[in-house]
Amino acid sequence: KLLYPDDTVQHAGVVTGLGGFAGHSHKYARKDASGYMFRLATVQNFSAVTAACLLCPAKIYDEVGGLDEKFEVAFNDVDFCLRVRDAGYRILYTPYAVLYHHESKSRGLDVKGEAKARFDRERARLEQKHTRKGLLCDPYYNPNLTLDREDFSENDVLPKE
């Protein structure tokens, strides 16, 4: 679990489809909160975790080809984890490893100029490699929950069959 300096959750697993591509579960929850269905306090599978704190056996890393260097900054971890999952392995989140993470402190945010252009290119690459439909169907996330927010709230629109 990664925490912001203000003791709120920055990352507790990645849900693909959040925000249209991928997002962090329970973002901004209190560090001592149990989360939706006790998920902040439970060891569980996720589609991805952030590379800010990711451990992987070298054998698996090599088997899937490591991190794709064409993702210079964003989504290299999501792409890597999806390839690990596609190879038949699981991506595990544990609440028992807790670190503070100053997200984007050293590089800034991807909101304007070249940083935004790079982010948009990397997002398009993620969708190209894993398909938009594939990203929107996270097997570890309830389809009745919203993809608009990272708080596990209910979806306002019923999913289409």
Would you name each region that the model predicts?
Residues 126, 132, 136-146, 151-156:
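Long, domain-scale regions corresponding to catalytic signaling modules most often appended to membrane systems
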Residues 111-137:
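Catalytic core of nucleotide-sugar-dependent glycosyltransferases
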Residues 90:
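Residue-level detector of anion-binding/catalytic polar loops
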Residues 73-74:
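A short, glycine-/small-residue-rich helix N-cap motif at loop->alpha-helix starts
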Residues 1-64, 78, 87, 98-110, ...:
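Acidic/His-rich active-site region of diverse nucleotide-sugar glycosyltransferases
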